[in-house]
A protein has these predicted regions:
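Conserved catalytic or regulatory cores that recognize and/or transform ribose-phosphate-containing ligands
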Residues: 1-96
Length: 96
């Protein structure tokens, strides 16, 4: 069983793209994986971007796999997460 971090675009999207994050988390959990979903890490949305990135990166470090949502390349945060995952030897999975 893998511990999977979900990465993808949020900023500027309707509902911060939470529906896509939740759908991916549901699918991955149904397959038996432990999932870290950044959309579930905080109940607030009033902090600066850097606050949420720090929170997400801390949670990501406990994972061994990153699951990249569609259009992840358009997200500054997801690009940072992808590069970190690559450098730490994570298994990388792209949403299809």
């Amino acid at each position: 069983m893998k511990r999977i971090y979900i990465a993808g675009p949020m900023t500027g999207l309707p509902e911060l793209n939470f529906p896509a994050f939740h759908a991916a988390a549901q699918m991955l959990r149904a397959d038996g994986h432990t999932v870290v979903n950044p959309a579930e890490l905080s109940n607030s949305t009033d902090q600066p971007w850097e606050y949420y990135m720090r929170l997400s990166l801390k949670a990501m470090l406990d994972c061994d796999t990153i699951y990249l949502l569609e259009n992840w390349q358009a997200s500054k945060g997801a690009f940072i997460e992808f590069n970190l995952a690559q450098n730490l030897g994570f298994h990388i999975v792209f949403a299809s």
